[in-house]
Amino acid sequence: MDRVELHDVEYGDCTVLVGQNRQILMVDCGSVSRYARRGEEEIDRRFNEIFSRYAPAAQRQFLLTHYHRDHMSGFLKQVKKDPGYFDRVYLPALPCDKRGVNPVLEFAVFAHFFAVPQSDFAQVNTTCLRIFDALNDSVGADRIFTLGGGDIFTFDGAFYEVLSPARNEPFPFDAILTEAVENLNICLSSPFHTGRETEFLETKDAFVRLYMQCQTAFAPSDRATPGRRRILLDSLRDLLGRMEDMRSNLAHSPAAPDIQDILNQSVVRNVYTETQNDLSLVFHNRRSRGPSNLDILMTGDVSDEVLRRISGKLFDGYYIVKAPHHGTESHFSNVIGDLAVAHLLISNGDYHAGGEISQRYIDMECIKHCTNAGACRWRDIAGGCCNRLQRCYEQPASGSLTLKCAAAAGERRTPCNIYVFVCAVVRRFDDIRG
């Protein structure tokens, strides 16, 4: 890995690992914001500039940590506009509970077919249902890969290991979500229904089972044959289409109001959203020797609970750590705070429901690289960056204050090889190479 580039997409995420051989791995690309506040231009323009920057790359890979708008909206628009842009796309595999039930998929199906249309895209996001179909029509089935805990993938000649969520182990889902899913199924299970409720339940169950088979068939290891993958995708599309055909009938079902009552409970919606966060792909590099400046930990939007569960798999320290969930206090973890971290990446922005950057990250003895200071109370109070009195050991005079960084004097190349793009115009891919 040659460098890491962090892009300001307001309240969203877009982190790009740039390889030595003109390869890139883009981890997430999305935002809940409509505008990039500094210039008030539409956020789509920012996405276009980002994708234009990496157009000259020899190979472009994309990894989606989880199915939330602030991590995938730009990506979905790009693959629709330019299906061949990414050579490989990694998707998160959604795990089951100890009973073999996948409550996230189950809830998503009910929300997709019964919920009243919402303006808040991130609240009950059901993109996971159509992701295989959408990417099959755009990037093509051969470029789709699913990842789960224990899987290994490669980038720029190095191996990266997925730490969470485990692919073959039950996930400890919140009881609020599992009970909600049970109640949703009960609503359609009455023998007194005279519509297509029973048919919908059977089709839904078949869809979820087939979806799980697709996740296995598209894994990096034990990958199914192209013919088998094509059959699975065609069957998945057929089942989704059959449920769509039942939509108007289901809208008049006596069970519909009860189902909508469950879906509209704020506590249930919030748990579903936080569960999606906790199912983020967490990954790090595999060391070939000892610690190095190639050590990186990417955390998606996971909570402290998830990080504590996988803490035994983490290194004692990392050169780069991506702060989970935009560096907010709600997702701060002492697991991160106790690591020896050289550089911390924080992607935050202007969003009323987002949250400020945690003071506990600011207190960490590492260099913080932030896309947007608008959510930083420290900067508002102190009138400057918390890095001013930090020492950077990547500078030629090791341990010099960050104020003496060559990049601060206008040099194109930073000693740490970490770049934050916050301006409206993003330079071309080759402009930073030393």
Predicted regions and their residues:
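Conserved beta-strand hairpin/beta-sheet module of binuclear metal-dependent hydrolase folds
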Residues: 1-57, 270-271, 275-304
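Active-site metal-binding loops of divalent metal-dependent hydrolases
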Residues: 9, 28-32, 67, 149, ...
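Flexible, acidic/histidine-containing loops and adjacent segments that form or flank the divalent-metal
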Residues: 2, 77, 81-295, 384-434
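C-terminal regions of proteins
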Residues: 324, 328-341, 345-434
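Structural motif
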Residues: 23-25, 58-61, 88, 160, ...
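Well-ordered, non-membrane alpha-helical segments in soluble/globular domains
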Residues: 37-50, 75, 107-133, 306, ...
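Metallo-beta-lactamase
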Residues: 58-70, 321-325
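Pre-active-site segment of Zn-dependent metallo-hydrolases
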Residues: 22-62, 73-82, 173-202, 302-317
